[in-house]
Design a protein with these regions (language model features):
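Glycine-rich beta-alpha loop elements in corrinoid/cobalamin-binding modules
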Residues: 1-91
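Radical SAM [4Fe-4S] cluster-binding motif and immediate context
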Residues: 93-94, 98-198
Length: 198
């Protein structure tokens, strides 16, 4: 419901901008959301990293031939047109770490406090990042199953992925399946990198 109320304001402020929907709802119901939100130009279906990179190239070169970009649902006069489906990213470890230095972090920090834990609630410089995609279950009614995730050493270990966190006091690693044994290289690694808050 929120996108329907925000979309007219966004379009009013940026009348010439390319306005793209995305996320879970858009992925499962692309034509419905384009009907519901007439201000949207198109919908990105599924993972957006590679799709948006190609969209930037199209816009940057002035071509705007979006039918050549995989993973989109486009408006086609009164109908809709799907481009070739986008394949899932085979290795999430290749996805760059968030570039915190490019974000206006103070805007996000205003909403840092959420009641997930005492530590998070008291934080004033906090961001959330999601480190896995999909679901480990195989429900027959689901349109998609299967998991892809970032190696835990790249989440909790030292190195480039930790460097950006100096700008943020807490970065929550949102992970719905951290308890699965296959997630952890060793039991010691799990003990050294998990702190449970009661």
């Amino acid at each position: 419901g929120r996108i329907k109320s925000l979309a007219p304001l966004i379009r009013k402020c940026a009348p010439d901008a390319l306005f793209i929907g995305g996320g879970g709802w858009s992925t499962y119901n692309p034509t419905e959301i384009l009907q519901l939100v007439p201000q949207l130009d198109m919908v990105c279906i599924g993972e957006g990293e590679e799709t948006f990179s190609e969209l930037y190239d199209q816009v940057g070169t002035g071509k705007r031939d979006f039918e050549k970009v995989n993973g989109l649902c486009l408006r086609d006069k009164e109908n809709f047109k799907f481009t070739t489906p986008r394949a899932l990213i085979s290795d999430l470890n290749t996805v760059p770490y968030p570039s915190y230095e490019l974000l206006e972090l103070d805007i996000y920090f205003r909403y840092s406090s959420i009641p997930y834990s005492v530590e998070a609630y008291n934080a004033r410089r906090r961001l959330s990042t999601v480190w896995e995609r999909g679901c480990p279950r195989g429900c027959t009614f689901c349109s998609h199953n299967g998991m892809s995730r970032i190696d835990l050493q790249n989440i909790y270990g030292d190195g480039d992925r930790k460097a950006g966190e100096k700008l943020v006091r807490i970065t929550d690693k949102e992970n719905d399946t951290f308890q699965l044994p296959a997630r952890w290289p060793t039991a010691e690694y799990a003990v050294n990198n998990i702190k449970l808050l009661y």
